């Protein structure tokens, strides 16, 4: 995958994540700057999605740890580089843990 496609994919993904949070009832702050999406929950915890262009990976930092995701062309999903778990499942779990609400991330 070339760098331009990688950035397009991450831009689209970050917009989907922002939209899912905007549609939720959670009290949180979203900041997207320099390719890094930061979600600040009411309790002060954060969920951070950052692009790692040289590796063509998306990194997620959550209260439960750090996770690296690769884009799977066959499924059109970002998958954990070890367990192959889809990004949406991790975001759902982290949001429930940190924000106390079950937020769906369709298509992720």
From Swiss-Prot:
GO molecular function terms noted in the UniProt entry: ferric iron binding; ferrous iron binding
Keyword ATP-binding among record annotations: no
One Gene Ontology term from the biological process aspect of the record: iron-sulfur cluster assembly
InterPro entries the record matches: CyaY, Frataxin/CyaY, Frataxin/CyaY_sf, Frataxin_CS
NCBIfam families hit by this protein: FeS_CyaY
Family: Belongs to the frataxin family.
Biological function: Involved in iron-sulfur (Fe-S) cluster assembly. May act as a regulator of Fe-S biogenesis.
Record-given protein name: Iron-sulfur cluster assembly protein CyaY
Organism from which the protein derives: Pseudomonas aeruginosa (strain ATCC 15692 / DSM 22644 / CIP 104116 / JCM 14847 / LMG 12228 / 1C / PRS 101 / PAO1)
Highest classification ranks of the organism: Bacteria, Pseudomonadati, Pseudomonadota, Gammaproteobacteria, Pseudomonadales
Originating gene: cyaY
């Amino acid at each position: 995958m070339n760098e331009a496609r990688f950035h397009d994919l991450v831009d689209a993904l970050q917009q989907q994540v922002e939209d899912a949070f905007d549609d939720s009832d959670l009290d949180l702050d979203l900041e997207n700057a320099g390719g890094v999406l930061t979600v600040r929950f009411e309790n002060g915890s954060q969920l951070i999605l950052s692009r790692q262009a040289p590796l063509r990976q998306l990194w997620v930092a959550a209260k439960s740890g750090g996770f690296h995701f690769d884009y799977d062309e066959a499924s059109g999903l970002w998958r954990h580089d070890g367990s192959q778990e889809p990004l949406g499942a991790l975001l759902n779990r982290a949001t429930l843990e940190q924000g106390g609400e079950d937020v769906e991330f369709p298509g992720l």
